[in-house]
Amino acid sequence: MSKKFAHTQEELEKLSLKELENLAASMREKIIQVVSKNGGHLSSNLGAVELSIAMHLVFDAKKDPFIFDVSHQSYTHKLLSGKEEIFDTLRQINGLSGYTKPSEGDYFVAGHSSTSISLAVGACKAIALKGEKRIPVALIGDGALSAGMAYEALNELGDSKFPCVILLNDNEMSISKPIGAISKYLSQAMATQFYQSFKKRIAKMLDILPDSATYMAKRFEESFKLITPGLLFEELGLEYIGPIDGHNLGEIISALKQAKAMQKPCVIHAQTIKGKGYALAEGKHAKWHGVGAFDIDSGESVKKSDTKKSATEIFSKNLLDLASKYENIVGVTAAMPSGTGLDKLIEKYPNRFWDVAIAEQHAVTSMAAMAKEGFKPFIAIYSTFLQRAYDQVIHDCAIMNLNVVFAMDRAGIVGEDGETHQGVFDLSFLAPLPNFTLLAPRDEQMMQNIMEYAYLHQGPIALRYPRGSFILDKEFNPCEIKLGKAQWLVKNNSEIAFLGYGQGVAKAWQVLRALQEMNNNANLIDLIFAKPLDEELLCELAKKSKIWFIFSENVKIGGIESLINNFLQKYDLHVKVVSFEYEDKFIEHGKTSEVEKNLEKDVNSLLTKVLKFYH
């Protein structure tokens, strides 16, 4: 184990403040160096270096549960925990995850937002039942604190009185936005020592004053709370320390020791700078949040420029065109304006498109109400994050049969973010819902046609599209979109047929081209719709082709294979179905091409499997 970064609690305690600051600086250099090569979450990690070091110094990482919300800011924790020798493999195939994972020695898996405080509450209960003296420490950002689940957990935690520390990393991504300059001024004015000493003086005053004066003093204290940052937490029954400087190690360590000694639930409010220590990233939240490989000196991406537009860019442009054409189109995203491409629409139509922060449930239900009022909502959301609003999809959209469009970005394998972010379940959890229509474009032109159709469609409808660019460009002529109608792209008398869905059409075409070079052939169908299927076309196909290969970027269970088998059973058709969808296991991180090769879903592996059926 390397000793440059890895430190036990005892070793950290022996370091002087200057040595700790030097350690923080070295860690920043290491993080910048590795992320510049591998990509990753840069600015959030640079902003949390001192917080992580202080956590490891005041608490025992070997026994106290360290819970990182989302955990994209856990790089310093990884280095302190002895991962330096494999840190260069960050986010690479078979390498170190960019998030926390129990298989790497972490307390709990994370990747989605706002779970940390609930985990801390559960850990508190378990520790109490075991009669142990451990203290959970949850590090959560102010952006993650905007989600309802965090407040549900705070509500119970404040009533429980369990020893627990919530370290709030406030980099002004959410908390400071609502009241802007006033909030910033008050946060600076209410320095920690002043606020804490004021509360102590009030407490002493209440002990000695007569009842009438006590009443007035309490009223004064309550009025004072209205302009202090800790009001919310104290009203929920939590102790509050802060705001403190999240880059001042002495101040953070002191606050953590104070919270630890309280033996109560306590929130420490630390103000940090996202991107701290890398001048090009400081203050530029969105640009440096999640990055690809870049040149450290210039900050410019080192990735070869892709002249093809991403599916997200295509969606954004098409929605802009539709919004200018149809004034009843509205839209929402949950804290992903740039990631979903909705930022362009929020900028142009601020009264029709909204970012509601990390609030997927609220996003869906609020748009359901707008649909009820005659508007046409487009909900722009990552496939993996729609999971967080499943009840709202059913209860508030499907049952009501409302005209809502779900635009699911990052469908399929997303690469380096790993199992918490792979978009491979949406087809399985949406297909069973009555009233729902599901479809996917294979290329840019079909995306445009599908979005136009989605606007005109009556009832809830969901389209899925990949991270990055479509593989196909103009290999096939687009078709008019009609409900439940597929497109026969390559038609012949082969007994073998390829059925593609979305990006899966491209994979099927790549395999088919390789087969054609070997003087083999197959029918190629773009399903377009997963629900409803084109039963007329499939019945015709079943007369000539008795072996169907499924190309779709979803898990097998509940995916296209399941839907096709249901169709075949319905009409008592006898066809052999071979699915190239994903197996029943979570897909880990790595470059998409490498992950596909590991899963034997790359073109060469698929070709090898298909060739076994040719004689």
Curated annotation (Swiss-Prot):
Give the matching Pfam families. Answer: DXP_synthase_N (PF13292), Transket_pyr (PF02779), Transketolase_C (PF02780)
- Which SMART domains does the entry link to? Transket_pyr
Which sites bind Mg(2+)? 142, 171
UniProt-listed Enzyme Commission number(s):
2.2.1.7
The note describing how and how many cofactors are bound reads:
Binds 1 Mg(2+) ion per subunit.
Q: Does the keyword tRNA-binding apply?
A: no
Task: Provide a GO biological process annotation.
Answer: 1-deoxy-D-xylulose 5-phosphate biosynthetic process
Requisite cofactors? Mg(2+); thiamine diphosphate
Extract the GO molecular function terms from the UniProt entry.
1-deoxy-D-xylulose-5-phosphate synthase activity; magnesium ion binding; thiamine pyrophosphate binding
Pathway given for this chain reads: Metabolic intermediate biosynthesis; 1-deoxy-D-xylulose 5-phosphate biosynthesis; 1-deoxy-D-xylulose 5-phosphate from D-glyceraldehyde 3-phosphate and pyruvate: step 1/1
**Can you state which reaction this protein catalyses?**
D-glyceraldehyde 3-phosphate + pyruvate + H(+) = 1-deoxy-D-xylulose 5-phosphate + CO2
Known role: Catalyzes the acyloin condensation reaction between C atoms 2 and 3 of pyruvate and glyceraldehyde 3-phosphate to yield 1-deoxy-D-xylulose-5-phosphate (DXP).
User: What quaternary structure, including any partners, is listed in this protein's UniProt entry?
Assistant: Homodimer.
- What protein family does this chain belong to? Belongs to the transketolase family. DXPS subfamily.
In Swiss-Prot or TrEMBL terms, this protein is called 1-deoxy-D-xylulose-5-phosphate synthase
- Species whose genome carries this gene: Campylobacter jejuni subsp. jejuni serotype O:2 (strain ATCC 700819 / NCTC 11168)
